[in-house]
């Protein structure tokens, strides 16, 4: 059985990394960084949006900014047809 990560990649998901800057609850003048990483679908990022909605509703640290990077680890350009049989002797 394939891993969940591999199955998601085969369905078009890519690895998404978000740098989330937020104000510390006890010291609102200070920013803290949280790095979040999960497989998600670009460009709408439903998983990331769900996490940020949870953050805004349930956590005390007010969001300041979010920077997102996304990369599909498996994509069509990595596949090519090879004709022939190779024998090792």
From Swiss-Prot:
Pfam families in the cross-refs: Usg
Which lineage? Answer: Bacteria, Pseudomonadati, Pseudomonadota, Alphaproteobacteria, Caulobacterales
| Superkingdom of origin organism | Bacteria
Record's protein name: Protein usg
Database matches in InterPro entries: Usg
- Ribosomal protein in keyword set: no
An individual GO BP term:
L-tryptophan biosynthetic process
Pathway per its UniProt entry is: Amino-acid biosynthesis; L-tryptophan biosynthesis
Q: Which gene encodes it?
A: usg
Record key words, sorted? Amino-acid biosynthesis, Aromatic amino acid biosynthesis, Tryptophan biosynthesis
| Function of the molecule | Probably necessary for the cotranslation of trpF. It may also function as a subunit or stabilizer of phosphoribosylanthranilate isomerase (trpF).
């Amino acid at each position: 059985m394939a891993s969940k990560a591999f199955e998601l990649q085969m369905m078009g998901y890519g690895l998404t990394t978000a740098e989330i800057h937020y104000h510390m609850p006890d010291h609102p003048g200070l920013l803290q960084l949280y790095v979040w990483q999960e497989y998600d679908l670009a460009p709408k990022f439903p998983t990331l949006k769900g996490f940020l909605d949870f953050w805004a509703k349930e956590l005390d640290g007010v969001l300041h900014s979010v920077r997102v990077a996304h990369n599909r680890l498996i994509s069509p350009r990595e596949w090519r047809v090879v004709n022939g049989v190779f024998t090792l002797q």
